[in-house]
């Protein structure tokens, strides 16, 4: 399945919540009717079945992290093999993606922009260039912007936006040096309460 390249606000309206696909500090609900789905009949909210509710939650999380279906299923399989809560394991695995860590550190204003920085070889992990967005970042890894990429206006703009957001406690960032450390895996309480990962577990357990 190809990566979605259409309007980002439409995806947030489809899921009925801000997926943080647009850059900026403020939530998008002030300019987007999140309670109304896109399309001519968007105002008519269909009653979802149990399966439909589970599917919507999976799609929401998949779109937040910008992961394709096959990748997402593989993350679930890995999460199920790990000890502990499968749903929490899944979210932690998604959080260790390099593109997500770059976003969390504030070097990209969105995960899509962070993914592009990684793909364009603007990001290093422990001093080595890594251009794979799905690269798994481990505790104490140092993520930095390559020296020749540090003059990019979009990175500076992203850091300015990030300075106004609540900073994740599991990363430590030196904005002046454009580098940060991934200190630990985030706890479930660190992540969005708007995600119900148990619905995803129920969906894939069928």
From Swiss-Prot:
Any GO BP: translation
InterPro entries (UniProt xref): Ribosomal_uS4, Ribosomal_uS4_bac-type, Ribosomal_uS4_CS, Ribosomal_uS4_N, S4_RNA-bd, S4_RNA-bd_sf
Keyword entries, A-Z: Ribonucleoprotein, Ribosomal protein, RNA-binding, rRNA-binding
Entries under Pfam families matching the protein: Ribosomal_S4 (PF00163), S4 (PF01479)
GO cellular component: small ribosomal subunit
S4 RNA-binding domain mapped to chain residues: 96-156
GO molecular function, one term: rRNA binding
Function: One of the primary rRNA binding proteins, it binds directly to 16S rRNA where it nucleates assembly of the body of the 30S subunit. With S5 and S12 plays an important role in translational accuracy.
Family: Belongs to the universal ribosomal protein uS4 family.
Assembly and binders: Part of the 30S ribosomal subunit. Contacts protein S5. The interaction surface between S4 and S5 is involved in control of translational fidelity.
PANTHER family: 30S 40S RIBOSOMAL PROTEIN, SMALL RIBOSOMAL SUBUNIT PROTEIN US4M
Protein name: Small ribosomal subunit protein uS4
Originating organism: Shewanella amazonensis (strain ATCC BAA-1098 / SB2B)
């Amino acid at each position: 399945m190809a990566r979605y390249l259409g309007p980002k606000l439409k995806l947030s309206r489809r899921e009925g919540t801000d997926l943080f696909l647009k850059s900026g500090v403020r939530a998008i609900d002030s300019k987007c009717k999140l309670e109304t789905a896109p399309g001519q009949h968007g105002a008519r909210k269909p009653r979802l079945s149990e399966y439909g509710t589970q599917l919507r939650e999976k799609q929401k999380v998949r779109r937040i992290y910008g992961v394709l279906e096959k990748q997402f299923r593989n993350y679930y399989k890995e999460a199920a093999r790990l000890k502990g809560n499968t749903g929490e394991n899944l979210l932690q695995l998604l959080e260790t993606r390099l593109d997500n860590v770059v976003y969390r550190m504030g070097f990209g204003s969105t995960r899509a922009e962070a993914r592009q920085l990684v793909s364009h070889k603007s990001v290093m992990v422990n001093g080595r260039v890594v251009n794979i967005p799905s690269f798994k970042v481990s505790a104490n890894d140092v993520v930095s912007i390559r020296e020749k990429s540090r003059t990019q206006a979009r990175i500076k703009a992203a850091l300015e936006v990030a300075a106004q957001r609540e900073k994740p406690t599991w990363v430590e960032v030196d904005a002046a040096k454009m580098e940060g450390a991934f200190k630990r895996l985030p706890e479930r309480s660190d992540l969005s309460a708007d995600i119900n990962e148990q619905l995803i577990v129920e969906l894939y357990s069928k």
